[in-house]
């Protein structure tokens, strides 16, 4: 059994499973799980000397407008191992556009059964302002030194937009 068998969640869109590809604060290497084999591949070495400000992964059985599963950032008290799966609750979404088109990054917090530390966070605006700024800065800058690549941050949207992003992507994947 591989990661491809992990369901999207227990109760979409509020209770999701996120497959972690990149731990928080890790070296500037972009990893991606190959959806067919379940193997973790090095996608590229990032040209900028930056690290992901939160764990980064995706929701299985979803298809975003960019052609990939829904991207999710998960702040946790400790970095998570690549290939691990964490039960989460979405709280918001960072809407962006890059050289390939529309690109959204859902932000989700660990489910209450894993830790009570994030229970007070109901919406992206409940996250620490510094963490939101770090996430936004990271995505505004992480492709800056890569030829032909760019990112424009369109802004933050709340929990309802994150839920809709997950539901729309789940439905898109079923087609």
Swiss-Prot record:
- So what family is this one in? Belongs to the PPase family.
Q: Which domain of life is it from?
A: Bacteria
Task: List where this protein forms a coiled coil.
Answer: none
SUPFAM superfamilies on file: Inorganic pyrophosphatase
| Protein name as it appears in the record | Inorganic pyrophosphatase
What reaction(s) does this enzyme catalyze? diphosphate + H2O = 2 phosphate + H(+)
Origin species, per record, is Pasteurella multocida (strain Pm70)
One Pfam family cited in the UniProt record for this chain: Pyrophosphatase
Q: What does this protein do?
A: Catalyzes the hydrolysis of inorganic pyrophosphate (PPi) forming two phosphate ions.
Question: Matching NCBIfam families, A to Z?
Answer: PRK01250.1
MF GO annotations: inorganic diphosphate phosphatase activity; magnesium ion binding
- The entry's substrate-binding residues are 30, 44, 56, 142
Quaternary state and interactors: Homohexamer.
Principal location: cytoplasm
**One annotated Gene Ontology cellular component of this protein:** cytoplasm
Q: What class of enzyme is it?
A: hydrolase
> Which EC number applies?
3.6.1.1
Entry keyword annotation includes Metal-binding: yes
Residues where Mg(2+) 2 binds: 71
Entry's CDD domains? pyrophosphatase
Q: Which GO terms describe its biological process?
A: phosphate-containing compound metabolic process
Q: Where in the cell is it found?
A: Cytoplasm
Which PANTHER family has this protein been placed in? INORGANIC PYROPHOSPHATASE
* Gene3D superfamilies linked to this entry: Inorganic pyrophosphatase
Q: Which residues bind Mg(2+) 1?
A: 66, 71, 103
Question: What does the UniProt keyword field contain?
Answer: Cytoplasm, Hydrolase, Magnesium, Metal-binding
């Amino acid at each position: 059994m591989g990661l491809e068998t992990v369901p999207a969640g227990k109760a979409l869109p509020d209770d999701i499973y996120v497959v972690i590809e990149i731990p928080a604060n890790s070296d500037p290497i972009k990893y991606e799980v190959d959806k067919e084999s379940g193997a973790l591949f090095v996608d590229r070495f990032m040209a900028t000397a930056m690290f992901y400000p939160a764990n980064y992964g995706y929701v299985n059985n979803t298809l975003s407008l960019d052609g990939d599963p829904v991207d999710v950032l998960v702040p946790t008290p400790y970095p998570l191992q690549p290939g691990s799966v964490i039960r989460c609750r979405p709280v918001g979404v960072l809407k962006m556009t890059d050289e390939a088109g529309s690109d959204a990054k859902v932000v989700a917090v660990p489910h209450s059964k894993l830790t009570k530390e994030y229970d007070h966070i109901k919406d992206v605006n409940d996250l620490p302002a510094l963490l939101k700024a770090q996430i936004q800065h990271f995505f505004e800058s992480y492709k800056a030194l890569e030829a032909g690549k760019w990112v424009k941050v369109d802004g933050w949207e709340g929990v309802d937009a994150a839920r809709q992003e997950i539901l729309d992507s789940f439905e898109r994947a079923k087609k």
